[in-house]
Amino acid sequence: MIPTRKSRCALAACAVALGFRVAAVSQDAAATAAGMQVEHATVAPDAIVHPFADGADQADALQRALDALQRGQRLVFAPGRYVVGRSLAVKQANVAISGYGATLIATDPDDQTIEMRGDGTTLAGLTLAGIGATRLTTPASTKVDVTGRGVQVLDVVIDGGASAGIFVFGGQDVAIVGNEVRATLADGIHVTHGALNVLVQGNVVRDTGDDMIAVVSYRNDGAPSGNVLIAGNSLEGNDWGRGVTVVGGADVTIADNIVRGVRTGAGILVAQEDSYRTYDATNVRVARNVVADIQQRASRQAGRAQTGQAAIDLNAGSGAVTRVDVTDNRIVDARFAGVRTLGNVCGVRVSGNRLDAIGGAPIARESRGCAAGQAIAGAANTLNGVALPPPARVGSQAVAFAVSGADETRMPRVRQWLRQVRGRGALAVER
């Protein structure tokens, strides 16, 4: 997907040619592959790159520095501004790229990503300034493209870009933690192509052109994405799309997030879509989220039609959405319904949710095709502080819908030793 160069050189020779120095003190790094963490491995010293003083395009030099890394080594970007005229690829396994205080400035909307191809690699601390006035759909137009296994993207700031901010394309055992994504023309964070065991935690996403966080499983992927934990993120404002969405996928948990200011769609959507030929969605937990200011007139973008979706919307086309638990969420200021089930949506529990200032039905039951007692169950929901009746007659409710969501024991451990508090050089606190 990304053009790469095959030139290689010894570390010392590259240091002279590229103007970067080798740190005098070795680091304790992680050699992580296939989800296995090996801490404090003996590795080569840090390699350090510096921005060109004249502001010239540095992409070729940076790619040579990346290619020269040894397994387990870290490349440190010294603080400053780096002009990068094409995409970069991290190909070596078990290396770390650290850039706290460094900004990479893209100049080509079609070719501006950092592809994290090597297994067990880490990208931490960089600020990526994107470019683009027209929305694009290619991996090379994203800002970070995760294709390897055991990849972690930590504390990266993405400002602008023609496509998605962070694009997880088939990666496994991936951690997307502590990042800030703003003003991309497509999704903020997008997980697809059969990605497995993905942690999306503690990120801030603002003002995107489409979904702020999305898990999408297309039939052409060959397998649905699964075991995804979306937790503790702060999301606000997008021109189109939803806040958090699972459109096809299995074993997903959406918990403890704040979702605000979604202008045209649902705050949280779990769906199967015919128009995009997606897989069904099943075994999804939606718990303890705050969902507010959804499709309000004052925030609507001119020329963008509102979808009429609920604040938390579960819907299916010709496929199915099954086994969804919507529990203990706070839903405030939604123009349409609070929670809705639409189409072939069965095995849903809606319990313990607090709803206020809802413009439509608090719980809209529009499911079809479900067996008796298998459409919706639940209790203890409130509207404006007043208890709501159960979403189905007690006698018709199924005894239990088995919904577990993501298996958190299979999530990757975050490489905290590679993180810093911005501007202070100290280790970050685990999110």
Regions found by a protein language model. Give the residues of each.
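Extracellular beta-strand-rich solenoid/capping regions of secreted or surface-exposed proteins
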Residues: 63-71, 82-97, 104-151, 165-168, ...
